[in-house]
Amino acid sequence: ADYYYDYTCMETLQGLSASELSSVDGRKWRTTYSDPDNTKREGLDSTVWPKAFERMEQFIQDTGLSQDDLDMNYDDIVEMYQSNKLAMYFGSSAGVKMFQDQGINTTFLPFFQENGEKWIMTTPYFQVALNSNLTKDETRRKKAMKVLDTMLSADAQNRIVYDGQDLLSYSQDVDLQLTEYLKDVKPVIEENHMY
């Protein structure tokens, strides 16, 4: 993976421990951690995170991850994959298409968990923050909600999708077809094992 970028370490940590982070304890921790009304500083708990870091440590040992790996960017990783120096890389369905178009046999795999579950990382995610002052001005709140409704609409989401790039929608009223590049993880998506 392109560990040069700080988000890759977090995505790897989360991907390796998606089942724990999606458990009752994991959801409870995430809810408390991200609650804007929580005035108590919330750190890593002693239930979910020790296992997550143990798994990350095992991953580092198993893969032989070194300081040199931490300095590689996305282009370095792509070049190594194209020249058969890497067996796997962390990417998207668009990457699968790109490599298949180059004649490289590539498939999309989920993160395999110790409990037998399979999960896929859904990044980048769509996150929105609305200013609490909107509750004081109904006209502005309605305008903000109209923008949000438009962004979450089926039309807007279908415009995002382009040849070989998938979009997994959390909106139940949006029907998006997966490209052939995610066919191998369709059961994982149908089980809603997306983190």
Please state what every model-predicted region is.
Residues 10-13, 79-84:
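Hydrophobic residues within well-ordered alpha-helices
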Residues 67-82:
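Short helix-initiation/N-cap motifs at beta->coil->alpha
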Residues 87-92, 107:
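Paired acidic/hydrophobic, glycine-rich loop segments that form the ligand-binding mouth/hinge
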Residues 74, 90-96, 124-126:
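Beta->alpha turn/N-cap motifs
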